[in-house]
Amino acid sequence: MQIYLDMCCLQRPMDDQTYLRIHIEAEAILGILAWCEAGNADLLNSVALEYEIDHNPHPSRKAFVQEALSKSVFTVQATDSVEQRAQHFGKFGIKVLDSLHLACAVEAQADYFCTCDYRFLRRAKQMDTGRTKVVSPLELIEVIEP
């Protein structure tokens, strides 16, 4: 199983935990990362994630995400096909970087693309993403720990 976590997921454990939903999602993300680290699934990286890491002004968040992605097994490159998919997704109102993340996951044929950006999640679930299922962290936890 291959899992692609977008940047909002990867940074969720660093967000303000006083909000219940954020706390629960953060715990879910930590569980997903541990599950991948235990060898139960492959965590994917991408040039889009690396771009966002490079431009992150918060050292602690940057270090946390770099550590999480250091265990990834594959980095999706920005091929012509990825760029075309991203442009296609963008035509449906999905932001540029979000489109690129989704395109990277679909191109890599990830089993799951996970985001905690609920506006993006709603739009992405309406897209044709082939075998890649678009999920929230809580939906993904239900899959890996039924």
State what each model feature region is.
Residues 2, 10, 17-26, 91-92, ...:
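Acidic, PIN/NYN-like endoribonuclease modules and their adjacent C-terminal/linker elements
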